[in-house]
């Protein structure tokens, strides 16, 4: 019988607008608390999720940007929880971010290469003591899930036994004004899949890390395995998704196929749910083909 390597979730950590660790953030989510509020930095936003005042300053590390310091903080906590030596030959680092240190480019006082995503990833890797070159995944809103898929495949291919996946983005004027130019910002808390005419998303900042490992002894209990994933491209346009939903449907089917999981076993969907008309319509189409209509799925969305 062929031995199939399993990929387990190890230690984790997160910083969100709802809390400074995984338990606090999940507890706030379960209680229905909202992390959105008016913010003045880095530019005025009517409803955004920002860290508690002073959090980034408290985590600051010499020689690192606020984002890099937060990534190191979360990665170190995840590593400790997994009882892992990040400096070993069997440990790799995958960094997931959409814009990274883009705020360094404001005012043009910083050399452009300081804002390169790989430059940032190398600084994080050095601080963690990781000897292998880091991998950077930057793929817009699917950066996080793509990084997990990449990390899992690194383990399955025998490149390493453990991967630290760390990701995050901070609020920035560049991102806020970019979405504002598309008229994609909600005037209040976003309402995914809602029929109201005031469509839009709510920006936020968060940083998190998780260890993926082939060693069940390092798995967080109760043990959770990452069984399958898929990435597709709808070949539409950088400013919006294809309205057919085909790309997302193929990704769902690919993930189920890789996991050898029948559709009937699905019990939860964590949808993107941006609150924008084109995206929400596309996702609704992708989740409503004939093969899914018999399922009643609890669904959450994240922006």
Where are these regions (language model features)?
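Active-site-proximal alpha-helical scaffold in enzymes
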Residues: 75, 128, 135-167, 202-220, ...
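Short glycine-aspartate micro-motif
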Residues: 9, 92-94, 161-165, 190, ...
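Condensing-enzyme catalytic core mediating Claisen C-C bond formation in acyl metabolism
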Residues: 4-16, 22-48, 189-259, 268
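Solvent-exposed alpha-helices and their adjacent loops that cap or buttress functional pockets
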Residues: 2, 85-87, 117, 128-130, ...
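Conserved small/polar residues in nucleotide/adenosyl-binding loops
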Residues: 293-299
């Amino acid at each position: 019988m062929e031995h199939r390597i399993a990929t387990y979730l190890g230690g984790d950590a997160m910083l969100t607008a709802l809390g400074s660790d995984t338990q606090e953030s999940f507890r706030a989510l379960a209680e229905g608390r909202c992390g959105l509020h008016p913010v003045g930095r880095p530019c005025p936003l009517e409803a955004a999720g920002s860290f508690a005042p002073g959090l980034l300053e408290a985590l600051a590390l010499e020689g690192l940007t606020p984002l890099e310091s937060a990534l190191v903080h979360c990665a170190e906590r995840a590593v400790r929880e997994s009882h892992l030596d990040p400096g070993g030959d069997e440990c790799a680092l995958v960094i997931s971010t959409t814009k990274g240190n883009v705020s360094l480019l404001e005012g043009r006082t910083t050399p452009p290469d300081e804002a390169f995503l790989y430059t940032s990833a190398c600084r994080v890797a050095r601080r963690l003591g990781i000897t292998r070159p880091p991998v950077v995944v930057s793929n817009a809103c699917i950066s996080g899930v793509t990084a997990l898929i990449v990390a899992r495949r690194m383990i399955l291919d025998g490149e390493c036994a453990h991967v630290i996946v760390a990701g995050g983005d901070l609020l920035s004027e560049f991102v806020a004004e970019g979405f504002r130019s598309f008229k994609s910002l909600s005037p209040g808390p976003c309402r995914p899949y809602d029929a109201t005419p005031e469509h839009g998303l709510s920006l936020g900042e968060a940083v998190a890390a998780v260890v993926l490992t082939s060693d069940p002894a390092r798995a967080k209990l109760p043990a959770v395995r990452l069984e399958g994933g898929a990435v597709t491209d709808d070949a539409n346009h950088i400013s919006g998704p294809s309205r057919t939903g085909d790309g997302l449907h193929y990704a769902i089917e690919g993930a189920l196929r890789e996991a050898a999981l029948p559709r009937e076993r699905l019990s939860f969907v964590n949808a993107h749910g941006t609150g924008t008309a084109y995206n929400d319509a596309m996702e609704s189409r992708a989740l409503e083909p004939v093969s899914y209509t018999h399922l009643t799925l609890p669904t959450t969305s994240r922006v």
